[in-house]
Amino acid sequence: SIRRQRQMCIRDRIYAPEGTGVNQYLESIDSYNQRAESPTTWKKQVYTGDDYLQKMLADHKGNVVVLAGNNQKKTRYIMESIKAGYHVLADKPLAINPQDFKLLTEAYQLAKEKNLLLYDLMTERYDILNIIEKELLHQTELFGDLQKGSPDNPSVIMESVHHFFKTVSGKPLIRPAWYYDVEQQGEGIADVTTHLIDLINWQCFPDETIHYQSDVTVNAAKHWPTPITLAEFSQSTQIDSFPAYLNRYIKNDVLEVMANGSLNYTVKGICIGMKVTWNYTPPTNGGDTFTSIKKGSKATLKIVQDEKNGFVKELYIQKEPDIDNRTFEAQLQKTVEQLQITYPFLSVKNKKNGTYLIDIPQEKRLGHEEHFSKVAKAFLHYVHNQDMPEWENENTLAKYYITTTAVEMAKKGNK
């Protein structure tokens, strides 16, 4: 984000409770400041008193607050920050239950009245695969029209598999203990689905406003737990015992984390299916996986990240069986040539059986760090120019209406 702009000294005023979260954050800043290539020059000013929120609000340093970490109080932090006159850039999720969602709607209304911006940190829009897929999605001569689908056969399907314990940049990823409490972290369908729903809104309904009261229906939602033993919990958190607040989730000495879920919903007549799975750790040489399918009348777009691809995301287009091979190939070539004007690195590889790889070289794919920088620049542009489109606000509310309604539906056992 801002801290990654070169040759700039950033005074980072950090307000947080003592614990793993703030320690990991400070270690990250140190690693950026000390790296060999393009080191940053952050100057840390840290406050870790119990009244960290009140201290931040009272100090009122600057005009932007970035909120991240424990999600249980995040919506309240958003509201208090807006009351205090801050623009807010918040890490997802902005709300994890219906009560949070109600407060979030009030926060957006207050921000509007005070000419302040509230922005959700959505990095996936800056992944080049998602950008190219969005372009292809609206090439009607190639893709056709996005199918409406049905609850039993959605036209858009997204599935992701994640892991609580894994190695990142050669180091084991240490989680704070509260990460295993769905009251603090949020259920799987309230958390990682935010990126997926945002992508669907952004790709399938570009520049369109989605009103959750009239354009959205949540059809079904389910959830189920991931079992975590004390040994696994200790390995992941470096804490020897389960904290008392997790006792209600423990059965036969095993922690049950309601991290998995599926939801089915409709936006403007398009039916969408989604599934999120959290395992404790990946298999040997394994990793996180992801599948996205969007069905058009002439072709289907797929993004796949799996073992076959070395856990690297790839974009494919597959023609419908009734579309002539030569006609489709000619249209695909024509479309790619048009896109190459803006994205000259694009190419196509025939993978047989009517499937084609839209090849994007690894060196043209920005890393996750650069995605954060892109979001920060977009947000700061909106702050400076006061020109954020209204669909950003409404579509974010629609997104959290979907997730929080799904959580409540899953709890009630609706299918």
Task: Tell what function each PLM region has.
Residues 191, 196, 201, 213, ...:
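C-terminal helical cap and adjacent loop that interface with cofactors, partners, or active-site loops
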Residues 41-89, 93-110:
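Beta-loop-alpha module in the N-terminal Rossmann-like domain of NAD(P)-dependent dehydrogenases
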Residues 2-6, 10:
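Single conserved hydrophobic/aromatic residue that forms the stacking wall/gate
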Residues 169-287:
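Rossmann-like dinucleotide-binding domain that binds NAD(P)(H)
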Residues 95-172:
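A contiguous active-site-proximal alpha/beta segment in oxidoreductase catalytic domains
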Residues 11-18, 44-49, 65-68, 118-122, ...:
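Extended hydrophobic secondary-structure segments that form protein cores and membrane-embedded regions
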Residues 11-38:
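NAD(P)-binding Rossmann-fold cofactor-contacting core
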Residues 84-86, 113-116, 270-274:
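A short helix->loop->beta-strand "cap" motif at the edges of active sites that frequently abuts
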